[in-house]
A protein has these predicted regions:
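Transmembrane helical elements of multi-pass membrane transporters/channels
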Residues: 1-64
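Hydrophobic faces of transmembrane alpha-helices in multi-pass small-molecule transporters and flippases
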Residues: 1-16, 98, 102-107, 111, ...
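Hydrophobic alpha-helical transmembrane segments in multi-pass integral membrane proteins
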Residues: 9-20, 176-189, 238-248
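Extracellular/periplasmic helix-loop-helix junctions in multi-pass membrane proteins
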Residues: 29-38, 124-133, 160, 166-168, ...
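Specific pore-lining/lateral-gate transmembrane helices of multi-pass inner-membrane transport
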Residues: 42-124
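Short runs within selected transmembrane alpha-helices of multi-pass transporters and secretion channels
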Residues: 113-118, 135-160, 166-177, 193-209
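Alpha-helical transmembrane segments
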Residues: 127-131, 149-165, 213-223
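C-terminal transmembrane helix end/exit motif
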Residues: 183-187, 198-257, 262-264
Length: 265
């Protein structure tokens, strides 16, 4: 459920600045009497988000695979009844790999952001994009850089099933993007377009980093003490629906033996 809400709120937070600026009387344009868009803002936002592709590629192809190896070894030491020294050694290796690969990905993306910053400004001016939009593109590039790092931090939290932390950072991200951009459109005016998105992302990234750091530094507590002492079956709405449709006996999927029948009491 947390992953679903994260996806919804993250996607909504990304598009909120665009949707809010579409309502601007000076920048918003109506197409065919129905659709709204803001040509200047949408164009530079699209090009700014293209700059995030290198980070996403390096994360999936390189960083995530290297991190997963240490992540797997850490939990193998736990589930295979390794002693404390084994678990602690795997934890230190995992944490070191995580921070090292995260720093490497940020440095790699920063080079491309600088490249887009230097070349993009010239290219946009060459194709006769307005100066205000070109200046906004520079700010949006840094905001998108923060978006990329924020997204990676969210994925790492998902690895550890840190649902509370994941929801916290996503709600903060969504509310800041909505609130600051509404304030920018209603109070600050056109000069704030793009900058409010940058501020929202900077604060969201700082908060997400703090949440991840606090979790990683206390990961043994969350893994061992954060679990319930006795298993309690979570009954969701799908289970309730199955009860109504099939009665007290439903088919369940066993992890090893396939389907079997169990009585729901």
């Amino acid at each position: 459920m947390a992953a679903f809400l994260y996806a919804i709120l993250f996607s909504g937070g990304i598009f909120l600045p665009n949707i809010i600026i579409w309502t601007s009387p000076s920048w918003g344009v109506t197409v065919a009497g129905t659709y709204r868009y803001a040509p200047l803002y949408d164009i530079v936002t699209f090009y700014a988000f293209l700059s995030m592709l290198p980070m996403m590629i390096i994360f999936v192809v390189y960083m995530e695979t290297r991190f997963y190896e240490t992540y797997f070894n850490y939990f193998q030491a736990i589930t295979r009844k390794g002693n404390f020294n084994d678990i602690e050694a795997m934890r230190k290796t995992m944490v070191h790999t995580l921070w090292f690969e995260l720093r490497s990905s940020m440095e790699f993306q920063f080079l491309f952001t600088i490249l887009f910053l230097s070349c993009g400004t010239y290219i946009l001016s060459w194709v006769h994009i307005e100066t205000q939009a070109v200046n906004m593109f520079d700010v949006l590039l840094m905001a998108v850089y923060f978006v990329g790092v924020f997204q990676i931090l969210g994925v790492i939290l998902e690895y550890f099933n840190a649902q509370r932390q994941l929801l916290r950072i996503t709600v903060v991200f969504f509310l800041l993007n909505g609130g600051l951009n509404i304030f920018g459109v209603l109070v600050l005016g056109e000069s704030s377009y793009g900058f409010t998105f940058f501020i929202a992302m900077a604060i969201s990234l700082f908060y997400a980093w703090k949440q991840l750091y606090a979790y990683i530094m206390n990961i043994n507590y969350y893994i061992f003490c954060g679990q319930p002492m006795f298993y309690q079956q979570h009954i969701g709405w799908l289970t309730l629906l199955a009860r109504r449709m099939y009665g007290p006996t439903v088919d369940c999927l066993d992890k090893e033996d396939g389907f079997y029948e169990t009585e729901i009491k």
